[in-house]
């Protein structure tokens, strides 16, 4: 299938970790001379596609931030959007010599409607752990001929559901300069993540509240549906136990932000599949304190980071303090992290391997 045309399908027009991987795959496929179509809603993702790529507009295929009765109504509307998207996808998926790659869980039902049985590869960026995810995955399962998971932890639930699974890891730029060393005064803890509830910002704020000598920087944007959550975080940051110690950076260059940090935290309360923010920090040799589940556990194993029990602000505060207090630990963790990234997550190797797994 070396010369096959590729159709990528995404549920959102926004850009976060999964869409950054999609853009790298698209660039690699364009470099191979393949005809490429990306079907997704309008937005930053479509705006960042190379000129050689055809964009086909889909309706948004995810749930918004509604709750209660509004969420029920939203789910009904989502069913209609899946049907509309499936009709748009049908002629694209059924063109001769086209391989379809679905980049997000919430696009699966539309792909099933558009292509029928065993019609697509699925690049799995979500660890399927809750009922909503399992329901959507079950709807889309007949359409998937192969699931390409970005970590073993992400592949395991799919194997249990009967999917044929292969693992192709995420990657980050390598080599990159080492960061860290002498602590800032006062020490700075950083987190690079979309401002959305499952990323665990509440847990991190409560942890830093227990560390009065530490400052916190939160880098990352937010989607409109999470405006209430962002307001909650901003209010928490002004409470007496945190006032003046928390900065919201918004969208920033990750390396530039991390240059001012001593410890990087990944506080997700649900398992991450293959978090790029963790790999980026590790590539720079910064010590990562991360929730001990999902792909994060795999990345931090063997001394390449410091895991803590997910959702536990007391344990997180203790882990941060331990890292700040021990220069030798920071150095050894940074060494192990950089060696791990060099061996397993160099994007120059991972993207071609992932593209081959999806297209073959």
Range-by-range predicted roles:
Residues 19-24, 196-210, 229, 314:
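A conserved mid-protein helix/loop that constitutes part of the nucleotide-sugar donor-binding site
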Residues 225-230, 243-251, 257, 307:
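Active-site donor-binding acidic/aromatic loop of nucleotide-activated sugar
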Residues 287-290:
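Short hydrophobic beta-strand element within catalytic cores of glycosyltransferases
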Residues 40-44, 216-232:
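Glycosyltransferase donor-sugar binding loop
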Residues 7, 172, 182-199, 205-211, ...:
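Conserved donor-binding/catalytic core segment of Leloir-type glycosyltransferases
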Residues 85, 100-108:
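Short His-centered aromatic/hydrophobic patch
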Residues 302-314, 322-328:
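Conserved acidic donor-binding segment of nucleotide-sugar-dependent glycosyltransferases
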Residues 322, 329-343, 350-353:
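A short, well-ordered alpha-helix in the C-terminal region of glycosyltransferases
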């Amino acid at each position: 299938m070396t010369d096959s045309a590729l159709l990528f399908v995404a549920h959102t027009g926004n850009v976060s970790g999964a869409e950054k991987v999609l853009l790298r795959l698209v660039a690699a496929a364009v470099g191979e001379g393949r005809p490429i179509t990306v079907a997704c809603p309008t937005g930053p993702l479509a705006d960042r596609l190379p000129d050689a790529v055809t964009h086909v507009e889909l309706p948004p295929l995810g749930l918004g931030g509604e709750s209660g009765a509004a969420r029920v109504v939203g789910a009904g509307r989502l069913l209609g959007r899946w049907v509309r998207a499936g009709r748009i996808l049908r002629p694209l998926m059924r063109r001769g010599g086209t391989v379809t790659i679905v980049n997000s869980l919430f696009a699966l039902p539309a792909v099933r409607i558009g292509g029928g049985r065993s019609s697509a590869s699925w690049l799995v960026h979500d660890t399927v752990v809750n009922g909503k995810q399992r329901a959507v995955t079950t709807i889309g399962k007949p359409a998937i001929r192969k699931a390409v998971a970005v970590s073993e932890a992400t592949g395991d639930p799919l194997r249990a559901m009967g999917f044929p699974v292969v693992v192709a890891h995420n990657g980050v730029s390598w080599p990159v300069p080492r960061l860290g060393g002498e602590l800032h005064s006062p020490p700075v803890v950083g987190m690079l993540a979309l401002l959305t509830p499952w990323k665990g910002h509440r847990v991190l704020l409560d942890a830093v509240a227990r560390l009065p000598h530490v400052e916190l920087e939160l880098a990352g944007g937010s989607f409109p549906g999470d405006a209430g959550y962002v307001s909650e975080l901003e209010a928490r940051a002004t409470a007496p136990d945190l006032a003046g110690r928390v900065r919201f950076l918004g969208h920033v260059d990750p390396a530039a932000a991390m240059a001012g940090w001593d410890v990087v935290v990944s506080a997700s309360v649900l398992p991450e599949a293959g978090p790029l923010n963790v790999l980026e920090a590790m590539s720079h040799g910064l010590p990562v304190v991360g929730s001990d589940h999902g792909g994060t556990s795999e990345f931090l194993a063997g001394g390449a980071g410091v895991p803590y029990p997910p959702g536990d602000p007391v344990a997180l505060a203790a882990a941060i303090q331990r890292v700040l207090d021990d220069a030798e630990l920071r150095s050894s963790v940074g060494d192990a992290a950089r060696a791990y990234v060099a061996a397993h997550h160099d994007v120059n190797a991972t993207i071609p391997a992932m593209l081959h797994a999806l297209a073959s």
